Regions:
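ASCE RecA-like P-loop NTPase motor cores
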Residues: 1-511
Length: 511
């Protein structure tokens, strides 16, 4: 036993876990229980899942797998050339002639696999190029109908890849058996090499799992994407549309009672949306009254001048958003969070508004441009009036109470992009299940995200803030009324000209 065994940090952690009455983990750690060979979390009478509205998307994200040809080639090259892993294994197995032979075969198999992989991607690239002019750096959906037109060469490469993977897995199993059965005879240095080797073995198993599903499993639950970088490099990716169905996970039966908590568990009076996404049929729902007086402390406006989203170009939309930001900052001189659904539009607005506000001594911070999320939030909350342009994670998890944030702009209703192949595939899957994609998935999901955006403003009973939604579909579209229902009772949405909104804001925010 190693002299540091008793103070090993991982053993210390597991010991603390075994002694604890309460364990706190994030959603991703919980979702990964279904992917682990052995569970890391103990069985328990109780499981409490806070911010449970995140669970479906996180479970789906954790179940997604990808193989990147560039990263794969770098990994293999790194192990063979830089780390000299297989040279070290040959030395370790000096007394094991059979294992030395396996190591040589395994190393050559890896090199052959990388070459075949590039050849397969070349044929996959040709397959998509037949029907689409521009495919590099695009998200492309691989369907059964399309793969049936794969060339004979592509079919041969795919079969060779599967054979090579099977050979690699067989050798991995034999080497693991030898190592584990003779573990006490190997030195500490040898065991460190084995740790790196086993980590790589796990990666090959993952690639095998991903590739097998990508080519052979055509159940509706699986969505396959091809993301080419050039002719012989790219990514393949699989997504499991049923990953969020909790009764099918490995961890769900290990808990007797599960409590799901969140400020956005329901959509208006609809309490079925989240349970349906999680595959739950029998749930007891309890709604607690909010401690916040939204009618008194919050306002929601839709400017009458807002441009028609459907007809506006990205430049026109960017110009309108920039003008709105400038007008608000000229009057209020308060920090403002502006939320986007498109990084392209965010960048357009940044480059339009940043020079204008900089002349007035006001800083504009933008996600993906001004540094890391943590760095941006730190600069944003420094007490000086500035503007933060954000997307994705900035819609939630931003905690800026009091006067740190009193103005929030939503540039566009937060619907998923229906042109994305993954979204199209998900909607087709839901339709096949008898679910109306727009009414029963897109609208509720957008509504809950809108509610989360409002939650950035009111973080305590003393907070005051105003939300401007620059998308007139909220008040003109038929589904707008359904979206509005997600806001707390007593909080109405007012449509008014921008000068009137500015006048009301002056009085409201300076109370």
């Amino acid at each position: 036993k190693d002299e540091l065994y008793e103070v090993d940090f991982l053993r210390h952690l597991y010991k603390k876990v075994a002694q604890s009455n309460v364990l706190i983990v994030n959603h991703a750690f919980l979702a990964q229980e279904s992917l682990r060979k052995q569970p890391l979390l103990p069985e328990s009478p109780w499981l409490i899942i806070d911010e449970a509205h995140h669970l479906p998307d996180i479970a789906s994200r954790m179940a997604s797998e990808r193989v990147n040809s560039v990263i794969l080639k770098k990994q293999v090259t790194h192990f063979i050339e830089k780390e000299q892993l297989f040279v070290a294994l040959q030395q370790i197995f000096q007394q094991f002639s059979e294992e030395q032979r396996f190591v040589k075969i395994y190393q050559q198999g890896l090199l052959d696999f990388v070459d075949e992989w590039q050849d397969f991607l070349f044929e996959l690239h040709r397959l998509f190029s037949k029907t689409q002019k521009r495919i590099d750096h695009q998200e492309l959906l691989l369907t059964k109908e399309r793969i049936d037109y794969l060339s004979a060469a592509g079919e041969k490469h795919s079969q060779t890849l599967q054979l090579l993977l099977q050979e690699l897995l067989t050798i991995q199993s034999k080497l693991q058996q030898t190592i584990m059965s003779q573990l006490e005879t190997f030195s500490l240095a040898d065991r460190i090499v084995f740790v790196r080797l086993f980590q790589f073995f796990d990666e090959i198993e993952r690639i095998h799992h991903c590739f097998t599903i990508y080519l052979d499993d055509w159940r509706p639950r699986w969505v396959k994407e091809y993301l080419p970088q050039n002719e012989d490099h790219g990514l393949i990716e699989i997504h499991d549309l049923e990953a969020s169905l909790l009764p099918e996970t490995k961890w769900y039966p290990r808990y007797e009672r599960i409590i799901y908590t969140s400020g956005t568990l329901k959509f208006g009076n609809n309490k079925k949306y989240l349970p349906q996404r999680l595959g739950l049929t029998e749930v007891t729902f309890k709604t607690l009254p909010t401690p916040y007086n939204y009618a008194e402390n919050a306002r929601v406006y839709v400017p009458e001048e807002a441009v028609a989203i459907q007809n506006a170009s990205s430049y026109e939309m960017g110009q309108y958003i920039s003008d709105t930001i400038e007008k608000l900052m000229a009057q209020e001189e308060r920090s403002m969070l502006v939320l986007f659904t498109s990084h392209e539009l965010l960048s357009t607005v940044y480059h339009q508004v940043q020079p204008r506000l900089l002349e007035k001594g006001q800083e504009v911070l933008a996600q993906g441009i001004s540094g890391s999320r943590e760095k941006i939030l730190k600069r944003f909350s420094n007490g000086k009036p500035n503007v933060l342009l954000g997307a994705d994670s900035f819609w939630e998890g931003v905690d800026l109470p009091g006067t740190a944030l009193q103005l929030l702009i939503v540039t566009r209703l937060p619907f998923e992009n229906p042109k994305r192949p993954l979204v199209q595939a998900k909607y087709a899957y839901l339709e096949a299940e008898g679910i109306q994609p727009f009414a029963q998935e897109a609208v509720p999901k957008a509504a809950l995200r809108l509610r989360q955006a409002l939650g950035r403003l009111i973080r305590s009973e003393e907070d005051r803030g105003a939300l401007l939604i620059l998308d007139r579909r909220l008040v003109t579209a038929k589904y707008g009324k359904r979206l509005i229902k997600v806001f707390p009772k007593g909080l109405s949405v007012k449509e008014a000209p921008m000068p009137e909104i500015l006048e009301e804001l002056k009085e409201f925010l300076n109370k």
